[in-house]
Amino acid sequence: MNSKVIKPFVRMLISDTGGGHRACAEALEAALGDRVTTDIIDLMVNSGTPGIEKMPAIYAWLEEHPKIWGVLWYLLDGPARCKALSDPAWLAARRRYKELITEGNPDLVIVLLSLIHI
């Protein structure tokens, strides 16, 4: 009898925005080894939403311009200001995020991006 073992499929959601998300996902992938099938998806880049798709590149640019980053941090710091930005972004990207979560019917989805706990 020739039975093929189907491995569980684990999807990890990250963004390359400097928080170590990819490093965490890669460490999990290494620890899980060949017991599971994994993929790592950058939610921002794959959001299908202009502006959000560019966030990793914007973040990288801001790392090179700390004074501008500081001004933006000061201007955007606070729950109300954060909500004013995140709510429209969520509305714009939520359909695509739901697709990214369910595509391929993963057995487990691990969100390693604290900004996007959906």
Label every PLM stretch briefly.
Residues 14-15, 112-114:
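Structural motif
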Residues 12-14, 81-83, 102-104:
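A short, structure-level motif marking secondary-structure boundaries and short turns
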Residues 27-100:
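Conserved N-terminal ligand/cofactor-binding loop architecture of enzyme catalytic domains
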Residues 21, 90, 108:
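Charged, low-complexity surface patches
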Residues 94-113:
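Short N-terminal targeting/anchoring amphipathic segment
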Residues 116-118:
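Conserved small/polar residues in nucleotide/adenosyl-binding loops
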Residues 1-46:
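N-terminal subdomain of nucleotide-sugar transferases
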